[in-house]
Amino acid sequence: MMEEKPLHESLSTAQRVFLTFSLMVGVFMAILDTTIVDIIVPKMMAPLSTDLYGVQWVITAYMTAAATAIMLVEWLETKVGLKKVFIAGLFLFTTSSFFAGNAQSLEWMITARVVQGFGESLIVVSAEAMLFSAYAPEKRGLAMGIYGLGVSFAPALGPTLGGWIAEHIDWRWVFYINIPIGILNFLGAMFFLPDYKPKHTFRLNFVSFFFLSVATVSLLIVLSKGQQLGWFSSELIGYLTFLSIGSFLLFALSELLSKNRLIDYSIFRIKEFVVAFWVYCFVLGFSMYQVFYLLPLYFERLKGLTTFQAGLHILPLALTIGLFSPVAGAISDKKSSLIPLVIASALYLYSVFFILSDFNYYTPALKSAFLLVPLGIGMGFFFAPITNLALKNLGTKTTLGVSLMHYIRFVGGSFGTALATNDLQKFMAESYDRMVEIQNYQRAWSFLEILTEWGGLTEEKAKYYLQSIQSLYALSDSFERTFFNAGYWALLGVIPILYLLYQSKKSLKPSMNERA
């Protein structure tokens, strides 16, 4: 029986290659949807008979469903095995893609996206757990490098692909394109993926799961809608915040009183997992998600590029991530996960503090695109080693570890996106007000006179033109400050990496003294 020995010992080379390919196609397709849909949101409004605020629920629904479903995967794994969980995820994701593409109303689209988000969770968690188990311990860094290629390359590629589809075909094909890929992958996985059911039992605590789900959904809606509704000046935001905090407290109480806990908290006694969990939350969620959110906005709103052009300018970032992710995985196997993590931290912090924080209106768009290469190298060196570090000592807790890492990715990423949105608006308002305060009114009136007398504009149009220029400069300054602020969260996130580096050097000293 295959369950009697580790999965990696049961696979031939051909089986392992197919398993890797099948899992990565599924992961790439699912994670690509997290950013590719962001690009087409404005184009959905008229066909779905809604406004910008209404159509944003298309993104919020997907995110909340995915985050909620994540904690079910470990239970499903013990019931049916990872292969069936992966296949079920493909079925849900592909089927809901068809209904999303055919959506004629906002309610229809939101329902399809909820199912799609649920399917995405089943795909990414089962695929990562199975891929990690399919490789021998000395090659798991490479496996996570391949997985990291999908996790990081897909969202970076989303704006380019989404922009091209929206401009040259139709926005509905963003969903339809998943159907043939999903069907082929579904059939291949059904017939050729090995059955794999880890040897441990798990009983789902439905009470804890309910409270955690309510808390998570409430929190994510607060973070995604807070800026739009005016944060705590809104009764809805206040109510949802209270509901989220209360549900988290009830979840904690349920876990304390129950003998059958939703989460095996002994996982947090494993030092490497705790470090990776912290880094994933702050570096990936709070910081990198800000960068992923801000870059398309920078090229479109400040540089005036079309959606597709903006995607092309982000493409060097995506390609660099894809190129260096397997390299980082190989280094993790041969040396240590700490080496590529230190490289990733240094390059990412340098890029955010000294490159992105200088992106403004006057930075040539093409120059900005090529300046994203160091950032791409840093991100490429990040995903494989941090995942390998998190999972290498978990044993039967691997699926739980994967689930928790993806859960904190969703929650941290929602915080990061909310921070970027809030900071961008706040800094823009501050810059605009400061600009008005120090404005030389005599020169401003002279400029208006030139526009009216020599430019042939009416006084109202001339004033509007001047305000537009001031707003553009304020937005330019806001992008610089928001990018810079994103770096502080990454700085907080890398502190445990420095601790592990210190510990590893400390442990090397006695061994060197013994040899001497």
Residue ranges of each PLM-predicted region?
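Short, Lys/Arg-rich, polar N-terminal cytosolic tail immediately upstream
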Residues: 1-11
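Structural signature of transmembrane alpha-helices in multi-pass secondary transporters
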Residues: 30, 62, 66, 93, ...
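12-transmembrane solute porter fold
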Residues: 17-32, 37-41, 48, 52-53, ...
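Helix-loop-helix hairpins in multi-pass membrane proteins, especially solute transporters
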Residues: 70-207
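Signature of the 12-TM Major Facilitator Superfamily
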Residues: 21, 57, 69, 84-91, ...
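Transmembrane-helix signature of multi-pass solute transporters
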Residues: 92-102, 181-188, 246-250, 323, ...
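Hydrophobic transmembrane-helix bundles of small-molecule transporters
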Residues: 167-280, 287, 313, 483
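Hydrophobic transmembrane architecture of multi-pass small-molecule transporters
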Residues: 408-502, 507-516
